[in-house]
Amino acid sequence: MARIFSNEPLKRRFIGKALVSFMLCAAVFPIPDLFSLPQVNGSLTYVEKIPILKLWGTPKEQGFAYGMLTGPKIIAVFSKFLESNNLGINKNQYESTIIPGLSRMKIEPAYEEELRAMFAGIRASTKENIHISFLKRELKYTDLLAINCLNDMIRMGCSSVSAWGKMTSDGLPRIGRNNDWHQIPAMIENQLVVARIPPPESGKLAFVSVSWAGIIGCITGMNEKGIVLTSHDASGLSPSVRTGFYPYMLTFRDVIESTSPGTAVKNVEDVLKRRVSGIGKNLMITIPTGSDGPAAVVFELDGDLTKESGFTKRFPRESDSYLICTNHFRIRKEPSGTCERYALLLESMKSIDPNTAVNKVTTKRIWELLKQVVIPGWRTHHSVVFEPDKKIMHVALEEIGKDAPFCQAVTLDVSDLLKLKK
């Protein structure tokens, strides 16, 4: 039987296919001039080895602080990403395919403003133009846009498992998440935990996410209400439209900034109905206890708007107090094979007798499961275990040659990270 994102590296043929799809998106953005802001609305600190970037204020203020505080990290991620032999992208392909594709991407004005400010912050931090040797030219604003669209072009393999109620030792939810991708040392070495605090008048929720320097979207995170978001690539249905695709990391940021317990499913639906994805994605949302509705849900989404507005919801069975997500659709599109990681996580959940107190899910057990579902040949860039009721994230970042779940985890208090110190 065929494998779906099995424990083998993806072939480079996916890159070419994704690049073709990437060209089918909408809006032109000029390169901004350098400008200054009166203050830096951010801080960069460390909890043990984990860098914590805290940003607050408007998109412009947050973007400038991001660039000012992490400029060298962003430059390293971008330049070494292009130079990686694992991706098969050459200079001509980048300049002739990816950059023209960016001119057709649809980016919300607030995100464009934030990226422009980030570019200005990087320039201010280095006090000079930034030469990218691989491209034989200076860094441009459009390159920052490319970083934030990179996962729309080159796919990731990830795993998540969520358990709650009778499946956990204390009845409270636990979520484990591995983020697996190509081995690119500069990206592994320049991961960040980012805490974002929007202005109260914005109506947006504060959140904490984990990703690479330069990314303003969200692939792994928890918001101030305890909503947990994890994303996973999947093989979706072919798009029914040819333009107007949104970078999915920015779409998922919209989700985490606007989703609350009690209305979570509707909140996510409202965002996805306004955002068209050009690729297949699984978006898993887990909700703290005490709310009406499901404890977790997976949204299987792609660009086929003729089928259920572009996404299909997958809920846990009524008898189950767990939900698993890897890299394939299970409802929207018939699975074409097996996924070893999904099967392993499913077997582990089924082995638990919810009527006994033995062998139930704990934070420690989630970590052991994450160790078992790393993808050989790739690297697990980050692993996170979430406790949404307590608003706690246990975060482990990969060290070169050592997958994230095998590295020392740091416990972070999300509520504390999202406070502005007086």
Functional labels for PLM-detected ranges:
Residues 12-14, 18, 178, 342:
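Hydrophobic alpha-helical segments, especially transmembrane helices
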Residues 18-30:
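Bacterial N-terminal signal peptides
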Residues 37-157, 170, 253-422:
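C-terminus-biased signal that marks the final domain/tail of proteins
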